[in-house]
Regions:
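C-terminal peripheral helix-coil segments that are non-catalytic and often amphipathic
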Residues: 93, 125-136, 155-199
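Alpha-helical DNA-contacting segments of helix-turn-helix folds
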Residues: 48, 55-62, 116
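Amphipathic alpha-helical packing segments from all-alpha helical-bundle domains
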Residues: 64-67, 112-137, 146-151, 181
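Short hydrophobic/aromatic patch on the recognition helix
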Residues: 38-48
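Short coil/turn segments at alpha/beta junctions that flank glycine-rich nucleotide-binding fingerprints
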Residues: 22-26, 77, 98
């Protein structure tokens, strides 16, 4: 694809992000996307076959970007617990900082369930791998990285969802700190064995 073609495709994706993020998938249309992008409808079909395809492309792109940021946090220098906290905060911040992305991902469940499932499974798999790599010294009950990963990410998702639904409220660092404090105090056996919880 030429540089000009890549720029046009990017313009369409940016327009679709705004349309889907503001109006939702079903209200948005190819014509509203191309109108926002400032291109003809025929141009759209040079890059995407359907409205569903550009939507799925956006969900996959959002997922790659988020996983990349979480991986960067997990691989950064420093203590394991600090890195895991930073990765979880990256996930939490996503839930509260970009309402359009959050809405698009949640709506994917009703547009393409397989893509929606893959989005969360890949995030959880990456986080679980980090937890598993650092599970030495934990009991069998504590060692299941999949349960821990989904549990921690689930907390981040729902605390972030609170901010998404409370439109009058701004994202708060205190929300994240309160959540991490809860995790810390619900995992005394890890500390007792010298293995820090991700706080």
């Amino acid at each position: 694809m030429t540089a000009r073609g890549q720029a046009t495709r990017r313009k369409l994706l940016n327009a679709a992000e705004m349309e889907f993020g503001n109006k939702g998938f079903h209200v948005s249309s190819v014509s509203s996307i191309t109108g926002r992008a400032g291109v003809g409808q025929g141009t759209f079909y040079l890059y995407f076959r359907t409205k569903e395809e550009i939507f799925v492309t956006l969900v996959q792109e959002i997922g790659r970007n988020l996983r990349g940021k979480m991986q960067a946090a997990l691989q950064a220098p420093g203590e394991r617990s600090s890195r895991e906290r930073a990765a979880l905060q990256t996930f939490f911040d996503f839930s509260v900082s970009n309402r359009a992305h959050f809405r698009i991902v949640q709506e994917a469940q009703f547009v393409d369930e397989a893509v929606f499932r893959d989005y969360y499974e890949q995030i959880a798999a990456d986080y679980a791998q980090s937890l598993e790599d650092n599970s030495e010294g934990q009991s069998a009950a504590e060692r299941d990285p999949q349960v821990r990963a989904w549990g921690l990410l689930g907390m981040g998702h729902f605390v972030g969802l609170r901010r998404y639904l409370c439109t009058a409220s701004d994202p708060s660092r205190q929300d994240f700190d309160s959540m991490m404090s809860l995790i810390k105090h619900q995992a005394p056996s890890q500390s007792a064995q010298g293995v820090a919880a991700p706080v």
